C-alpha cells in the first residue's frame, strides 16, 4: 500500500520472511486503504444530484425540454432567482432572461436597463434612475420590445412599474422590488416577476454538436479607452469616445453580424443576426431614422469600404470596430475622405 514499506518488506523477504507482527501491520494498512476507497465511493454516490425540472416544452411546442439548476456559487442566474408571480418559466424565458442579465452585467455603476427579444438585446439604456434607463431602452425599438424580457440592475420602483404595466412583457427581473411595484404587477397575472440579487456568468459555455461538444471561456473582455488605436486623421471627441465604448458593450452581446448606432451616450438602434455586414449596417440606419452625427460600433472588421461609404451618406461622425482586415487601408482612406473618425479595438466581438 505504502511505498515507504517497500524497502523493509524486501529486506524481510530476503532474510527469510515477514514476522507475524509485520504481517499484521501491513494487513491493517491494506484494509484501511480499501475502507477509505469504499468511503470515497459512498460519499460520491451520496451527493445530491443536480436539481432537474421539466419544462412545458422547448423552443417550440413539439420539443421536450428541461432545466438543470447549477451548483452555487459557480454561477448564479435565472434558475436561482425568486419568482414572485406569473406562469412557470419556459425554455425561451430562461434563454432570454440569461441574455438580458449577461448584457446587464456590463453596467456596474449607472442605473441600467436591458430589453431582450429572441436572445438578443433590442434596447439598452442608462439613466439617473432605472425608470429613465427603461424609457431610453424602450425608445431604441419599442416595436421589438413587445413581448420581451426586461432586466434592471437596481430596485424596481413604483414609477418604473407603472411604465412597464402599460406594455406586454414576458419577464421583469431586478435585484429587488418596492412593495408598491409588486402590487402593480399583481394585476398582470401572466407577467413573470423575478428577483435576483447577483448574477454570476459561468466561466465556460458549452454547446453540444453532432458527434461531440464545444466549450469556451466566457468573454470577459473589457474595452477601455487606452486599448483604442485611431488610424484616421480625424480623432474621436471625448463624447464620441464614451458613446463608442457604451455602444461596444451592447454590440458585444448582439448576435453577429451586429451594428449598434449611438449618440450622446444613448443607444439609437441595434441591428443583429445578419449574414451580411452591409445589410446589418443598412438595417441599423433604417431603424435609427436620423443617424447624422452618430457613432457606429461593429462587432467585426469591415472587409470592404462599401459600409463606410454607406455611413458617409448618413453623415455618421465616428466608428469603433476591431480592425484587422487586409483592406484596412482602403477603409481608413474612405473614412479620411468622408471626414469620419475611426478607432480600432484590436479584438472582435462575434456572438453566435
Which stretches of residues belong to each language-model region?
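Short acidic-hydrophobic, aromatic-tinged amphipathic segments that line or gate anion-handling sites
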Residues: 1-2, 194
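Internal, active-site/partner-interface "lid" segment
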Residues: 3-47
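ATP-dependent carboxylate/acyl-activation modules
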Residues: 9, 33-352
Amino acid at each position: 500500500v505504502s511505498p515507504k514499506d517497500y524497502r523493509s518488506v524486501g529486506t524481510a523477504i530476503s532474510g527469510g520472511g515477514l514476522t507475524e507482527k509485520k504481517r499484521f501491520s501491513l494487513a491493517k494498512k491494506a484494509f484501511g486503504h480499501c475502507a477509505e476507497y469504499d468511503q470515497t465511493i459512498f460519499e460520491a454516490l451520496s451527493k445530491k444530484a443536480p436539481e432537474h425540472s421539466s419544462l412545458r416544452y422547448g423552443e417550440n411546442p413539439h420539443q421536450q425540454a428541461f432545466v438543470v439548476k447549477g451548483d452555487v456559487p459557480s454561477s448564479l442566474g435565472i434558475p436561482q432567482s425568486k419568482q414572485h408571480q406569473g406562469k412557470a418559466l419556459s425554455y425561451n424565458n430562461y434563454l432570454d432572461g440569461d441574455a438580458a442579465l449577461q448584457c446587464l452585467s456590463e453596467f456596474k455603476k449607472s442605473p441600467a436597463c436591458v430589453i431582450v427579444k429572441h436572445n438578443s438585446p433590442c434596447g439598452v439604456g442608462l439613466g439617473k434612475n432605472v425608470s429613465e434607463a427603461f424609457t431610453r431602452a424602450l425608445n431604441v425599438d419599442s416595436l421589438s420590445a413587445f413581448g420581451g424580457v426586461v432586466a434592471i440592475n437596481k430596485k424596481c420602483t413604483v414609477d418604473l412599474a407603472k411604465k412597464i404595466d402599460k406594455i406586454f412583457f414576458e419577464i421583469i427581473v431586478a435585484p429587488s422590488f418596492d412593495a408598491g411595484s409588486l402590487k402593480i404587477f399583481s394585476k398582470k397575472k401572466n407577467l413573470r416577476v423575478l428577483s435576483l440579487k447577483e448574477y454570476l456568468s459561468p466561466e465556460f459555455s458549452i454547446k453540444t454538436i453532432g458527434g461531440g461538444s464545444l466549450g469556451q471561456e466566457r468573454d470577459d473582455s473589457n474595452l477601455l479607452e487606452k486599448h483604442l488605436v485611431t488610424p484616421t486623421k480625424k480623432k474621436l471627441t471625448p463624447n464620441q469616445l464614451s458613446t463608442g465604448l457604451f455602444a461596444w458593450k451592447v454590440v458585444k452581446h448582439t448576435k453577429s453580424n451586429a451594428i449598434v448606432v449611438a449618440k450622446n451616450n444613448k443607444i439609437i438602434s441595434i441591428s443583429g443576426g445578419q449574414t451580411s455586414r452591409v445589410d446589418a449596417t443598412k438595417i441599423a440606419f433604417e431603424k435609427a431614422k436620423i443617424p447624422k452625427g452618430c457613432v457606429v460600433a461593429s462587432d467585426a472588421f469591415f472587409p470592404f469600404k462599401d459600409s463606410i461609404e454607406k455611413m458617409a451618406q448618413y453623415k455618421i461622425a465616428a466608428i469603433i470596430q476591431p480592425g484587422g482586415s487586409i483592406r484596412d487601408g482602403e477603409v481608413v482612406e474612405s473614412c479620411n475622405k468622408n471626414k469620419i473618425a475611426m478607432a480600432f479595438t484590436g479584438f472582435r466581438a462575434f456572438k453566435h
